[in-house]
Amino acid sequence: MDIAIHHPWIRRPFFPFHSPSRLFDQFFGEHLLESDLFSTSTSLSPFYLRPPSFFRAPSWIDTGLSEMRMEKDRLSVNLDVKHFSPEELKVKVLGDVIEVHGKHEERQDEHGFISREFHRKYRIPADVDPLTITSSLSSDGVLTVNGPRKQASGPERTIPITREEKPAVTAAPKK
C-alpha cells in the first residue's frame, strides 16, 4: 500500500482549502500591493487563508464605500466616486428613494483599459422632504447628498400626569 507524503511547503493546487487569492477581494482598477505579486512564507501553507482585503492598508478602507448617516438635523450620504467626473454621475430622487448612478466608458489607465458603472439606492426617511435634497462633489472625489430633517411641529412641552382613584384593570365577573 502506497501512502502519499505531502510536504507542507509545497503548494497543492487542488487542495480544497487552498486560496492564494480571492476574486472578491480584488479592487479592479486600483494599484497592486507587493503582497499581491509575491507569496509570503505563510501563504505557502495549504491551510493559509488570505486575510480579508480590509486588513490590507488604511488607504483601501475608504475605497468605493458609501455611508448613510441620520444626524440630529439632517440626512447625510457620503459615497466615494473618485473614478468618475461630475459629468459621469447622476443623482435623482424618485418617490422616497435617492438614486445615484455613475458610468464611464472604457478608457486607458496605467494597467490597461477599464470601464466602470454602479447604481446605489438609499431610502429617504419620512422626516426628510425629498424636495430639499442637495448633492455636492468634493475635490477628493467624495459625493455628498444632504437633506435637512423636518423640525418637530411646535415646541416641546411636558404633559402632566393625573391620578385616578379607580383601577384601570378590573377583575372579570365570576360565572
Curated annotation (Swiss-Prot):
Q: Which residues carry this modification: N6-acetyllysine?
A: 92, 166
Keyword list (alphabetical) reads: Acetylation, Chaperone, Cytoplasm, Eye lens protein, Glycoprotein, Lysosome, Metal-binding, Methylation, Nucleus, Phosphoprotein, Secreted, Zinc
Please list the residues that carry the modification N-acetylmethionine.
1
> What tissues contain this protein?
Lens as well as other tissues.
Report the glycosylation sites: 41, 170
Q: Per the record, what is one GO cellular component?
A: nucleus
The record's Gene3D superfamilies line, in alphabetical order, gives:
2.60.40.790
Is the DNA damage keyword given for this protein?
A: no
**A Pfam family of this chain:** Crystallin
Q: What does the subunit comment say?
A: Heteromer composed of three CRYAA and one CRYAB subunits. Aggregates with homologous proteins, including the small heat shock protein HSPB1, to form large heteromeric complexes. Inter-subunit bridging via zinc ions enhances stability, which is crucial as there is no protein turn over in the lens. Interacts with HSPBAP1 and TTN/titin. Interacts with TMEM109; in the cellular response to DNA damage. Interacts with DES; binds rapidly during early stages of DES filament assembly and a reduced binding seen in the later stages. Interacts with ATP6V1A and with MTOR, forming a ternary complex.
Q: Which family does it belong to?
A: Belongs to the small heat shock protein (HSP20) family.
Protein name in UniProt: Alpha-crystallin B chain
Instruction: State the taxonomy lineage.
Output: Eukaryota, Metazoa, Chordata, Craniata, Vertebrata
